[in-house]
Curated annotation (Swiss-Prot):
Organism per entry: Debaryomyces hansenii (strain ATCC 36239 / CBS 767 / BCRC 21394 / JCM 1990 / NBRC 0083 / IGC 2968) (Yeast)
Keyword Heme: no
Protein name (Swiss-Prot/TrEMBL): Negative regulator of the PHO system
Domain Protein kinase: 8-290
Gene: PHO85
Example GO molecular function: ATP binding
Catalytic activity as recorded in UniProt: L-seryl-[protein] + ATP = O-phospho-L-seryl-[protein] + ADP + H(+); L-threonyl-[protein] + ATP = O-phospho-L-threonyl-[protein] + ADP + H(+)
Length: 330
């Protein structure tokens, strides 16, 4: 990786995280737009482990639904990761194009399909993302969705590695992680995908908890309070309590009335309480709800920005009416 910081021009600040600031930038050589993730290096602590992890994993993950890392520029006091530029994250996309955040179901279908493809590629390469949320899913103006921010991602060598349970933003955190499991599998990413799926349909977070316990209660209210009969071994988790209020599972149709029965079936398969009962990304992509997506290429027409589509349709209609107008032939 041979670039230098002078090769890129900062255009505007896009966001700021725990250890990095992200800018929209331009490659001075070819004019290409990029995202510049700048990490200030502490003279004593050196490069943050999250940055090292992100770089090492993203160099290995080459897929159409994962943001491309073009370059890494290392100077004395700063590390700059040069990524392909994406127009907005899913959260901002929902705010801009949704009906109070809720997206058209054709868009939901294409986005969740692309999300699952990205997840499957990660899992096939033995990588857990561990921080899937709308803010980390990036959309470009072609309607392509890509996984970004692999700062918390981990490679897993065997199915039951022991990891920290302080992963995944609270609202998208799987119940097994909330219950204190430190030995979990790729199924935690699947739960997050289910939460994102529901949020795209309704425009609202499915489980907007304020603390670990509140998050569990919100999940139980909808999915039912687990016990040894419904989830063998659940009582052995560190955060399990015998005095939880007993909730019965609710019908997801009441919460997401605009989603058809096949879509609800897929959502339910993603949001299984027991991690071993959750569908895999590969299985999910074979679900009948996706059968109409015959072409897996994300550049299908319905993946495009709805605003751009309406603009294009208006222009086409104007051109057609102009061609049909007898005045144009006089």
């Amino acid at each position: 990786m041979t670039g230098s910081s002078s090769q890129f021009q900062q255009l505007e600040k896009l966001g700021e995280g725990t250890y990095a600031t992200v800018y929209k930038g331009r490659n001075r050589t070819n004019g290409q737009l990029v995202a510049l993730k700048e990490i200030n290096l502490d003279s004593e602590e050196g490069t943050p482990s999250t940055a090292i992890r992100e770089i090492s994993l993203m160099k290995e993950l080459d897929h159409e639904n994962i943001v491309t890392l073009y370059d890494v520029i290392h100077t004395e006091n700063k590390l700059t990761l040069v990524f392909e530029f994406m127009d907005k994250d899913l959260k901002k996309y929902m705010e801009a194009h949704g009906n109070q955040g809720a997206l058209d179901l054709k868009i939901v279908k294409s986005f969740i399909f692309q999300l699952l493809k990205g997840i499957m590629f990660c899992h096939d390469n033995r990588v857990l993302h561990r921080d899937l949320k709308p803010q980390n899913l990036l959309i470009n103006n072609k309607g392509e969705l890509k996984l970004g921010d692999f700062g918390l991602a981990r490679a897993f060598g065997i199915p039951f590695n022991t990891f920290s349970n302080e992963v995944v933003t609270l609202w998208y955190r799987a119940p097994d992680v909330l219950l204190g499991s430190r030995a979990y599998t790729a199924s935690i990413d699947i739960w997050s995908a289910g939460c994102i799926f529901a949020e795209m349909c309704t425009g609202k977070p499915l489980f907007p908890g304020t603390s670990n316990d509140d998050q569990l209660i919100k999940i139980f209210r909808l999915m039912g309070t687990p016990n040894e009969r419904t989830w063998p071994g659940v009582s052995s988790y560190a955060n399990f309590k015998n005095n939880w209020q007993i909730f019965v599972p609710q019908d997801l149709r009441l919460l997401i009335p605009n989603l058809d029965s096949m879509g609800l079936n897929l959502l339910s398969s993603l949001l299984q309480m027991r991690p071993d009962a959750r569908i895999t990304a590969r299985q999910a992509l074979q679900h009948p709800w996706f059968h109409e997506i015959s072409n897996p290429n994300p550049l299908m027409q319905h993946l495009a920005d709805p605003y751009q589509q309406s603009q294009q349709q208006s222009q086409q209609q104007a051109q057609q009416s102009q061609q049909m107008d007898p005045q144009t032939y006089r």
